[in-house]
Amino acid sequence: MPSFDVVSELDKHEVQNAVDNAIKDLDRRYDLKGKGTFEFKDKEQTVLLTAEEEFQLEAMLEILRLALVKRKIDVKCLETKDPYASGKEKKQEAKFREGIDKDLAKKIVATIKDGKLKVQAAIQGEQVRVTGKKRDDLQEAIALLRTKEFDMPLQFNNFRD
């Protein structure tokens, strides 16, 4: 029986490259030169932005988003927290989200069921497995999911006949 998985994954090397590019871009900006830093924590997949003022944090966040787009990483996976003061500096944390949580998985399953396609969707941890009798039905399900807007970037992998 043909099937595929709906997942939300990040290429960690591309994320690292995007953060490195953002650091280089920050050094090139004369208005932010020496006034802000990016600190990337690989294990937690977080970036700590540090600057003197809050508007500089916003500019740094925009630099990071542009670097992600250049590396073809969807910006929807970046979750930012509110800026906070730490001594004379302002700090903000940005986390890269990965995997499909329960609420999003339920939305995906509901979208597929509302589409009245001849496929079944089942939640399996941080992914959704979609099975059907024909390959064409699965391709319709992929097309349906691509038309909908979700709060995480979705990838379709493990396509089996």
UniProtKB/Swiss-Prot annotation:
Gene Ontology molecular function: nucleotide binding
Record-linked InterPro entries: DUF520 (IPR007551), UPF0234-like_C (IPR035571), UPF0234_N (IPR035570), YajQ-like_sf (IPR036183)
GO CC term, one of those recorded: cytosol
Keyword Mitochondrion assigned: no
Entry annotated with the keyword tRNA-binding: no
Protein origin, superkingdom: Bacteria
Keywords linked to the UniProt accession: Nucleotide-binding
SUPFAM superfamilies: YajQ-like
Function: Nucleotide-binding protein.
PANTHER family the record matches: UPF0234 PROTEIN YAJQ (PTHR30476:SF0)
Family: Belongs to the YajQ family.
Entries under HAMAP family matching the protein: YajQ
Protein's name according to its UniProt entry: Nucleotide-binding protein PSEEN4469
Protein's organism: Pseudomonas entomophila (strain L48)
